[in-house]
A protein has these predicted regions:
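Short linear capping/connector segments at secondary-structure termini
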Residues: 111-118
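N-terminal intrinsically disordered/low-complexity leader segments
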Residues: 1-13
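Hydrophobic/aromatic residues within well-ordered alpha-helical segments
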Residues: 64, 68, 72, 104, ...
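Solvent-exposed, amphipathic alpha-helical segments
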Residues: 21, 25-28, 71-82, 158-165
Length: 191
């Protein structure tokens, strides 16, 4: 039994490492130009070993985005279940969103920004739109109009802007920028 568990752990580890390597390569080189062979080489496995876990780049991209979206969807479900949200509840949810963004890091943000067209053309693209829209709807007060939904979207985008600024402009401490993004997001939501 222990030998079987060791094999399963290696498979899981290889899969998780493949997702991490692919995320970095997709973010830095682009989804379109990154090949399965390149992912396998960076991972230190054969293309056949990678193929055991993922048959296509689309499967890899979908797995990466689904992992990210699961956390966002959980926030949206939590926010919806707690309606109507108090200011303190909204603040807590935005703080959790900030933690989720920090967990995924700059590579996820760059992946989405730099490969937006490709992502939107895949089935996961619709899921990205739906999950983000559900979070915006849950964080916007009941009966709010377009202006309040835009306020929520703007608040959530502060974390992406901070991460990109830190990565591209080498503008100070990334943690300080994320803290500033949180403060700005909360100010925006407070109106």
């Amino acid at each position: 039994m222990a030998a079987r568990e060791g094999v399963d752990n290696r498979r899981t580890d290889t899969r998780e490492r493949a997702l991490a390597v692919a995320l970095e390569l997709f973010a830095t080189h682009g989804y379109t130009v990154t090949s399965l062979r390149e992912i396998a080489e960076h991972l230190g496995v054969t293309k056949a070993a990678l193929y055991f876990h993922f048959r296509t780049k689309e499967e890899i991209l979908t797995a990466i985005l689904r992992g990210y979206l699961d956390g966002i969807a959980a926030l949206a479900v939590d926010a919806t279940a707690r309606q109507p949200l108090t200011a303190a509840m909204r603040e807590e949810l935005v703080r959790r969103f900030a933690e989720h963004q920090a967990h995924w890091g700059i590579d996820l943000i760059l992946l989405v920004r730099q490969n937006y067209t490709e992502i939107q053309s895949l089935p996961i693209g619709e899921e990205v739109r739906e999950v983000m829209a559900s979070l915006v709807a849950a964080l916007a007060p009941a009966g709010s109009g377009p202006a309040e939904r835009l306020r929520v979207r703007t608040a959530l985008s502060a974390f992406q802007i901070a991460a990109v600024t830190a990565a591209r402009d080498n503008d100070g401490d990334g943690d300080a920028l994320q803290e500033a993004a949180l403060a700005i997001a909360l100010e925006i939501l407070a109106g």
